[in-house]
Regions:
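Small-molecule kinase domains that catalyze NTP-dependent phosphoryl transfer to phosphate-bearing small molecules
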Residues: 94, 120-122, 138, 142-192, ...
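Short, acidic/turn-prone active-site loops that include or flank metal/cofactor-
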Residues: 33-36, 57, 131-134, 155-156, ...
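Walker A (P-loop) phosphate-binding motif
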Residues: 1-26, 31-33
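ATP-dependent NMP and nucleoside kinases share a basic, alpha-helical "lid"
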Residues: 93-101, 106-142
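An amphipathic alpha-helix signature
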Residues: 24, 46-50, 133-138, 151
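ATP-dependent small-molecule kinase phosphotransfer cores
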Residues: 33-106
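Short gly/ser/thr-rich secondary-structure transition/capping motifs
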Residues: 88-92, 107-112, 151-156
Length: 201
């Protein structure tokens, strides 16, 4: 199995790249989705997060992600505390899913905070999606985020330069969806499929 990490800053287009890779036959695990699942009520991380951050982050008994974000995004110590709870649980959940896959599979782990979680060494190959910051900001505005929230979230992540230090392949996503699709198809044909085939031998 070829284990690929797919990373990039908020608003870069990671999810779209993940969707295209899935259409091309890769199996995609979305760490953001797993992060939501591991802190749902009744899940392993729920009690830990509520104990760490208090009842003010709850809405009707569930952890309210926007309330939690408001607490942690301005405080790097609190953000690190949250990450120290969530990251191990997400890794464990991803590993369980990976164990069910056939040996020749291409497994894409979509991980926004790959550098921050020091997770690159667990993968055979790292792909970074990057885009001009103003384009990313515009995409995030379209998602309904306010400018100050966008600034906080971008500031909470490492720079593209830091991501590129651990990257094997960079996909620029400043253009059209057609251009992005062609770039992802080239990644699959020229890099991922040959590597997966070699591993399967």
């Amino acid at each position: 199995m070829l284990r690929v990490a797919l990373t990039g800053g908020i608003g870069s287009g990671k999810s779209l790249v993940g969707e295209i890779l899935e259409e091309l036959g890769a199996l995609v695990i979305d760490s953001d989705q797993l992060a939501r699942e591991v802190i749902e009520r009744g899940s392993p991380g729920y009690e830990e997060v509520v104990t760490a951050f208090g009842d003010s982050i709850l809405s009707e008994g569930q952890i309210d992600r926007s309330k939690l974000a408001a607490v942690v995004f301005n405080e790097s110590d609190l953000r690190k505390k949250l990450e120290s709870i969530i990251h191990p649980l997400v890794r464990e959940a991803a590993e369980k899913l990976a164990r069910k896959l056939p040996s020749g599979a291409i497994l894409i782990n979509q991980i926004p905070l790959l550098v921050e979680s020091d997770g690159a060494k667990r993968f055979d190959y790292v792909v970074t999606v990057s885009a001009d910051e103003e384009i990313r900001r515009e995409r995030l505005r379209l998602r309904g985020l306010k400018d100050y929230e966008i600034t906080q979230r971008i500031a909470a992540q490492v720079s593209d330069l830091e991501r590129e230090k651990i990257t094997n392949y960079i996909i620029r996503n400043d253009g059209s969806i057609d251009e992005l699709t062609r770039a992802v198809e080239a990644l699959m044909a020229n890099e991922l499929l040959p590597r997966a085939q070699k591993q399967g031998l």
